[in-house]
């Protein structure tokens, strides 16, 4: 049995991970560590399990991190935005010699923490990074197709959408602005390249996609997630892309338009004698408008889907496999928090291979993940009369375009 500390345990993702872990026999203790300590206590009180307690942590105060993680077997880091928080947290955890899981989805800092591999190995630490939905589940489903379904895999395309969460924090909005502002890596024609969200090369990659259980012709946009960088390191591929969106479309459009107008900038401007940071205003404005947009569009409950499309050859013929993880009543919190909790559980079971800083495809057996997450999410679905989770849906598309649903 393992003691787990969940950093950022009060957030949309962290709180789901806390609740999931608290219900697992293999987990002996869960500490909800958050800057909002009172909210952490309230969450622990709602769960009402002797396993769950609360603690204070500040991602930018190393001593508070060290205090919060003391005595843990595994630390799960859910504190965003990761481009500013993950390095000091991972440094503190590695220095303490504790195994680590996170849901980091910022590609730029992912490259930086992968460079901490030698440091983690020297301390005997296993650090599983990007263990959410995308990245996370996507990496493992891509690996599953590559290892077991296709003789040759040419391309992996990752598509995702979600929306309607009960809460969204400032870090989530900041992450979206960040995603639209930085170079977006895409692995095309066997080479890593970069496109820009608002420039013609990025606009050319926009498309629509039919997400099972969610809707048809959902617009999706280039996303700077880590899969495009990490998957080609471990799998011989010619293409890896990542595209996504947030629902409803009107809400995503607001975020996109504010960013396009320059309101994601962090340099203060003078407004009638007051120094105002456009980014801070835009985040606050988005969070205020979100409730109005959800009401206006009739978006009354969360939903989400993450799809992995693997294309290549099987028995000398073109073949495509499509994995979908879809839900009509779960979204970012569950879609990311439950895979993260499963990553922690696999760590506690001793099923994560090796030491160092590694993405999922480097150290997790895909079927270990698929079997465990299917069990956990189906149990969670009972909260919503069985509507919550559609399971891991697998489809095959043959050379004639005929789609067949398969069992995993």
Indicate where each model-derived feature is located:
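C-terminal catalytic/substrate-binding lobe primarily of soluble NAD(P)-dependent oxidoreductases
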Residues: 148-408
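Short beta-strand element of Class I
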Residues: 29-31
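ADP-ribose/adenylate-binding Rossmann-like module
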Residues: 81, 92-110
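N-terminal Rossmann-like NAD(P) cofactor-binding module of classical short-chain dehydrogenase/reductase
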Residues: 73-77, 100-101
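Helix N-cap at the beta1-alpha1 junction of Rossmann-like dinucleotide-binding domains, i.e.
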Residues: 36-38
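N-terminal Rossmann NAD(P)H-binding glycine-rich loop of SDR-like oxidoreductase domains
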Residues: 6-20
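Rossmann-fold NAD(P)-binding glycine/threonine-rich loop
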Residues: 103-126
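Conserved Rossmann-fold cofactor-binding substructure of NAD(P)-dependent oxidoreductases
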Residues: 56-71, 81
């Amino acid at each position: 049995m393992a003691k787990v500390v969940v950093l950022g345990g009060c957030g949309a993702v962290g709180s789901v991970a806390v609740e999931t872990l608290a219900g697992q026999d293999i987990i002996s203790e869960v500490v909800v560590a958050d800057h909002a300590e009172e909210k952490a206590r309230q969450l622990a009180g709602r769960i009402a399990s002797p396993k769950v307690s609360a603690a204070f942590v500040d991602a930018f105060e190393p001593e508070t991190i060290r205090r919060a993680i003391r005595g843990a077997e595994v630390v799960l880091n859910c504190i965003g935005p990761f481009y500013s928080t993950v390095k000091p947290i991972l440094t503190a955890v590695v220095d303490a010699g504790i195994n680590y899981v996170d849901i980091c989805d910022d590609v730029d800092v992912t490259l930086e923490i992968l460079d901490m591999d030698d440091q983690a190995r020297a301390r005997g630490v296993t650090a599983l990074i990007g263990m959410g939905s995308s990245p996370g589940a996507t990496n493992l489903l891509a690996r599953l197709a590559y290892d077991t379904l296709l003789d040759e895999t040419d391309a992996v395309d990752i598509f995702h959408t979600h929306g309607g969460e009960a809460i969204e924090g400032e870090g989530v909005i900041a992450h979206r602005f960040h995603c639209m502002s930085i170079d977006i890596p895409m692995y095309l024609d066997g080479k890593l390249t970069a496109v820009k969200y608002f420039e013609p090369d990025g606009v050319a990659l926009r498309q629509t996609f039919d997400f099972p259980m969610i809707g048809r012709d959902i617009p999706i946009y280039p996303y700077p997630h880590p899969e495009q960088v990490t998957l080609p390191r471990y799998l011989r591929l010619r293409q890896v892309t990542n595209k996504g969106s947030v629902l409803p479309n009107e809400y995503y459009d607001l975020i996109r338009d504010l960013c396009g107008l320059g309101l994601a900038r962090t340099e203060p401007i003078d407004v009638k004698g007051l120094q105002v940071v456009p980014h801070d205003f835009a985040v606050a404005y988005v969070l205020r408008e979100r409730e109005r947009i959800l009401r206006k569009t009739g978006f009354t409950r969360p939903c989400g889907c993450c799809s992995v499309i693997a294309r290549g050859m099987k028995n000398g013929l073109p073949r495509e496999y499509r994995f979908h993880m879809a839900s009509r009543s779960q979204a970012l919190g569950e879609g990311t928090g439950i895979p993260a909790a499963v990553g922690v559980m696999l760590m506690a079971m001793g099923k994560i291979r090796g030491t160092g800083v590694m993405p999922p495809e480097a150290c997790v057996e895909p079927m270990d993940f698929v079997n465990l997450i299917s069990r956990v999410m189906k149990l969670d679905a009972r909260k919503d009369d069985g509507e919550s989770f559609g399971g891991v849906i697998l489809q095959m598309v043959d050379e004639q375009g005929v789609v067949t649903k398969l069992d995993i």
